[in-house]
């Protein structure tokens, strides 16, 4: 019984982290799906989302506002707006001018953008950890008083619920809306979409904006969950989310969701049963294995040219 | 409507197209024929903005279009298909037709999210147009299939339907009958004629299937080794000695 409770605890922790990985991974996978580049500055967009949320929360506290739902909504909206604008600007400034050039050029441009944003936040906000108020506290406990108890915190429930809502909206948007339809068309054949009169530049911008908005949501959630942020906050999370995207099949949106969850669970199981030190080894080990044996990922489809 | 004047296209040392001229009038089907490698598709690529020609002029409705980017040309109403099928193969048949009307819908993101009456009305209109063209090319039953799973002949017809929902003035078809069986070719034959008769679209096509070309073309241009060889009505072309030589080789 105790073993089962312990297992369930790891599963809950894993799914919590995993769903935020999935939120960030969407940004990688959509951008890759549409213009075939890895946006290495995406982790920084997520970090900036977390900082913006923190600034908004601090500002509201200074104004003496204490009503939690209002604080959360304002923080979320601010983070989404700032991150989306950043995502849009990064594409406009660093990627669009080099689009269509050799594949390495946008990649290097992305790495440059990532370093720039990281250092910008270093300068503007200082390089030390800043505490992030928990805001949502408490939770449920299961199991006997005197032995191991499985707990699920309200924060974790918030993370699940928010992720679920975001993913549902995204899926509906992609499958039903006019812009979602155009996104799919552009990702399949950019040249043809252009010929048919779709403004492909706008669609590409939209992809960056959507990915950045979801990353901002993850930034707020993980900031609260971990309790502190620093300018390097986006780097590892970005790499993890990238791994999740590759694991699920880069370019595939359901793949990013699945990859995030699998990666989160794998990590928490490693920390729970082996050692926390090994969790990065396992996640990047998974990345290597998937690249070796199934380079298209779990849900990615190999491109077959019909002749 | 369309006038190509002394078009030349040079790739390094190779003069792929040399002083080709042709014109397409309103309400007309014009064919471009010639042996393999004659430069037909290169002419097409110049006309549709895929290549920037190295010499000559292309006038569409009186305006020069040579060297303009392809999407600008297509927005003027000059749409093309390619030798190989280029559908959005992982989207459904009807989605292929809806996405082609993206520009015509001209709505913004907000009205989509709020699902305003105006947005719904425009969506409904494009859906109606898609349904009309699906019926027209006989693919209504396939509307919700993935385009990539259709038979080859159906994919070809869907491509033409996708061009037509954009309401073009001039349709350029690059080997539309390639890979079709005789029955399918006959259907295509009728479809192209009806585009001209019923929808007032001019058509330029490249085709190797001579029966198709002779049946439907109002005029034919023959190109050989990048140079114009002959032009005229199907009857004139059929009797032209130069054309016969080029196709059969000199005895």
What are these regions (language model features)?
Chain A
Residues 1-25, 52, 63-75, 101-105, ...:
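Membrane-interfacial amphipathic/re-entrant helices at transmembrane-helix boundaries
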Residues 2-20, 127, 152, 173-178, ...:
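Inter-helical junctions in multi-pass inner-membrane proteins, predominant
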Residues 19, 28-51, 100-105, 179-182, ...:
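Short, non-helical or kinked segments that cap or interrupt transmembrane helices
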Residues 20-28, 41-61, 86, 90, ...:
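Hydrophobic alpha-helical segments within and immediately flanking transmembrane helices
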Residues 33-41, 85-131, 173-180, 235-250, ...:
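Short loop segments and helix-boundary regions at transmembrane helix junctions
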Residues 34-37, 41-89, 93, 149:
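Membrane-embedded helix boundary and interhelical linker motif in transport proteins
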Residues 148-229, 253-258:
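Helix-loop-helix "hairpin" substructures at the membrane interface of multi-pass membrane proteins
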């Amino acid at each position: 019984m105790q073993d089962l409770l312990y297992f369930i605890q790891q599963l809950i922790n894993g799914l919590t982290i995993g769903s935020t990985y999935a939120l960030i991974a969407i940004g990688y996978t959509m951008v890759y799906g549409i213009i075939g580049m890895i946006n290495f500055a995406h982790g920084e967009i997520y970090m900036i989302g977390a900082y913006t949320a923190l600034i908004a929360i601090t500002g509201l506290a200074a104004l003496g506002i204490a009503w939690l739902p209002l604080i959360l909504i304002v923080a979320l909206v601010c983070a989404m707006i700032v991150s989306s604008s950043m995502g849009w600007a990064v594409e406009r400034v660093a990627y669009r001018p080099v689009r269509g050039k050799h594949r390495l050029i946008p990649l290097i441009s992305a790495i440059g953008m990532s370093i720039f944003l990281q250092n910008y936040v270093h300068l503007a906000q200082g390089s030390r950890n800043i505490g992030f108020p928990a805001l949502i506290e408490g939770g449920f406990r299961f199991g006997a008083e005197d032995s191991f108890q499985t707990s699920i915190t309200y924060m974790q429930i918030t993370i699940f619920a928010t992720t679920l809502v975001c993913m549902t909206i995204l899926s509906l948007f992609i499958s039903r809306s006019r812009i979602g339809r155009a996104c799919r068309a552009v990702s399949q054949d950019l040249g043809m979409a252009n010929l048919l009169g779709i403004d492909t530049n706008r669609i590409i911008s939209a992809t960056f904006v959507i990915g950045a908005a979801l990353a901002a949501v993850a930034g707020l959630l993980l900031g609260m969950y971990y309790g502190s942020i620093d300018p390097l906050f986006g780097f590892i999370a970005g790499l993890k989310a990238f791994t999740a995207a590759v694991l699920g099949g880069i370019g595939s949106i359901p793949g990013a969701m699945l990859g995030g969850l699998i990666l989160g669970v794998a990590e928490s199981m490693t920390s729970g049963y082996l050692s926390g030190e090994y969790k990065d080894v396992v996640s990047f080990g998974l990345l290597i294995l998937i690249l070796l044996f199934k380079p298209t990922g779990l849900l990615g489809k190999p491109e077959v040219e019909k002749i | 409507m369309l006038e190509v004047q002394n078009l030349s296209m040079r790739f390094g040392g190779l003069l792929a197209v040399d002083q080709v001229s042709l014109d397409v009038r309103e309400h007309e089907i014009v064919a471009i024929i010639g042996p393999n490698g004659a430069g037909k598709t290169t002419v097409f690529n110049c006309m549709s903005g895929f290549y920037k020609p190295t010499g000559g002029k292309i006038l569409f409705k009186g305006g020069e279009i040579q060297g303009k980017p392809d999407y600008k040309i297509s927005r003027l109403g000059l749409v093309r298909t390619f030798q190989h099928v280029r559908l959005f193969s992982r989207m459904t048949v009807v989605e292929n037709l809806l996405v082609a009307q993206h520009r015509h819908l001209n709505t913004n993101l907000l009205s989509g999210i709020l699902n305003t009456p105006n947005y719904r009305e425009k969506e409904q209109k494009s859906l109606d147009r898609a349904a009309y063209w699906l019926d027209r090319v006989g693919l209504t039953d396939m509307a919700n299939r993935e385009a990539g799973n259709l038979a080859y002949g159906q994919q070809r017809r869907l491509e033409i339907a996708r061009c037509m929902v954009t309401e073009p003035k001039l349709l350029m078809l690059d080997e539309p009958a390639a890979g079709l069986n005789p029955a399918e070719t006959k259907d295509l034959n009728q479809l192209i004629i009806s585009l001209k008769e019923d929808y007032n679209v001019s058509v330029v096509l490249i085709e190797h299937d001579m029966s198709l070309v002779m049946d439907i073309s109002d005029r034919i241009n023959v190109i050989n080794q990048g140079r114009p060889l002959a032009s005229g009505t199907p009857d004139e072309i059929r009797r032209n000695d130069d054309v016969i030589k080029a196709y059969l080789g000199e005895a």
